[in-house]
Design a protein with these regions (language model features):
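Short aromatic-glycine motifs in intrinsically disordered, low-complexity regions
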Residues: 60-75, 252-263
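Surface-exposed amphipathic alpha-helical segments
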Residues: 80, 244-288, 379, 386-389
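Conserved polar/disulfide-associated segments of primarily extracytoplasmic proteins
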Residues: 86-240, 250, 299, 303-313, ...
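C-terminal motif of bacterial Sec signal peptides marking the signal peptidase cleavage site
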Residues: 19-21
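Proline-anchored loop/turn motifs at beta-strand termini and strand-loop-strand connectors
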Residues: 69-88, 265-273
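Charged, amphipathic alpha-helical linkers/stalks
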Residues: 279-308
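Bacterial N-terminal signal peptides that target proteins for export
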Residues: 1-9
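Short, low-complexity, disordered segments immediately C-terminal to signal peptides
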Residues: 23-44
Length: 393
């Protein structure tokens, strides 16, 4: 059960990433490998331009289709657009929800996109394949031979998730074993043979505005195989997933230099423990109902209404472990990135990582942040939100 929940929620949260313009434009944190892949250079924070202000805000995604409450939150530039959300799926009780969303800069072309997990199934049982050929769905999972992560990115992710973008050229790919290890993809499980690998590809294309773009797309392939005794002998079934699928993009030549803000946004991602609790209980109920298919959103709502708001100790431990995984995503994806700095927020009594290069950082009780290099700037002059200046750790 935990394995299934981890895979689903993992994509949702690994996806809590974004990319911003490399320029120190108005941006607040707040209330609401193989050749061809460029290595991100480790650079120290550059001083911000005089008078520059970065404003970031915390965006909360409401799961309007399911729980009705916050699913997760993440840090995004205050003037960027968020589109998408969580979709509850009716044909797969073991993966009842997926997420797809994009956060984009309307004044430029930078952005992040999170893609839905892909649940797949394969077997060497020829009789079963005769009834469920490649491309069909078997208990909500697509029947498809197992692929490695780089193959899956090229054969599954790009054709399905970037189908509307013509002229895509893959300019490089890279295996990411440390990312797979950090996510515990392929961790041993009793009674099954597990596997897990991660990779990224970099693509180039011309967007609709005629701007040359670069985009890095990440994914993990993981799954488990198990033997089954039949009258024809022992056959092997495999449930596998392409998950943690997300990308960040920028105009060509600016992708790597956007990394510090991307890392800060990734590290700011937080899943709501109440949503995590309800989601896992829904999976548990559906599996206990012998994989009974939900036939309507009304029926799904009734399932969700039966969840217990009280979070058990075991569920909280599971939640905390999941959050640690999401933190490791930021570490591994951007392990060579510098340009972020750590601050202590006395209001929240917590540490926060923000883009570097700014001399002054302010926060308020709503959890918003303003970064500036202007010594004379005081947000309290133009606001009644009780801004307080915070210091580097």
């Amino acid at each position: 059960m935990e394995k299934i929940a981890r895979i689903i929620v993992g994509c949702l949260l690994a996806a809590g990433v974004s990319m911003s313009s490399c320029q120190k434009a108005d941006a607040v944190r707040g209330g609401e490998g193989k050749s061809g892949i460029k290595a991100t250079s480790a650079v120290q924070p550059e001083p911000a331009k005089a008078g520059a202000i970065m404003r970031l805000k915390k965006y909360s995604l409401i799961d309007s289709q399911g729980t009705g409450g916050e699913a997760f939150s993440l840090l995004i530039p205050v003037d960027w657009h968020f589109e998408g959300g969580v979709t509850w799926v009716l044909d797969n009780p073991t993966m009842p929800a997926t997420a797809r969303f994009a956060v984009t800069n309307p004044a430029g072309y930078e952005g992040l996109e999170v893609f839905p997990n892909q649940a797949l199934f394969w077997t060497n049982n020829r009789m079963l394949l005769g009834m469920f050929p490649i491309g069909s769905r078997y208990f909500g999972a697509e029947v498809h031979p197992v692929l490695g992560p780089e193959e899956a990115l090229s054969a599954i992710v790009l054709p399905r998730m970037k189908a509307k973008q013509p002229g895509i050229k893959v300019i490089g790919s890279k295996s990411l074993p440390e990312l797979a290890k950090a996510l515990k993809a392929g961790a041993p499980q009793s009674g099954v043979q597990t596997f897990g690998q991660a990779a990224k590809v970099r693509i180039e294309y011309m967007n609709m505005a005629g701007v040359a773009m670069e985009e890095d797309i990440f994914a993990v392939v993981e799954g488990f195989s198990y033997p089954i005794q039949t009258m024809q002998g022992v056959i092997t079934n495999t449930n596998w997933y392409v998950d943690y699928i997300f990308s960040f993009k920028a105009p060509k030549g600016k992708l790597d230099q956007n990394a510090p803000l991307f890392k800060a946004m990734t590290d700011s991602f937080r899943v709501n423990p109440g949503w995590f609790n309800a989601y896992n209980q829904v999976i548990d109920m559906l599996v206990k109902a012998q994989l009974r298919q939900i036939r309507s959103m009304g029926e799904l709502s009734r399932y969700i209404s039966q969840t217990n708001n009280e979070i058990s100790d075991s569920m909280m431990r599971s939640y905390n472990e999941r959050q640690k995984v999401y933190d490791r995503i930021g570490e591994k994806v951007s392990e060579s990135i510098r340009g972020t700095e750590h601050y202590y927020n006395p209001i929240e009594a917590s540490e926060v990582e923000l883009p570097g290069g700014y001399q002054y950082v302010w926060t308020n009780p709503s959890g918003e942040y303003i970064l500036t290099d202007s010594p004379g700037y005081n947000p309290n002059v133009e606001s009644n939100k009780n801004w307080q200046e915070i210091r580097k750790k």
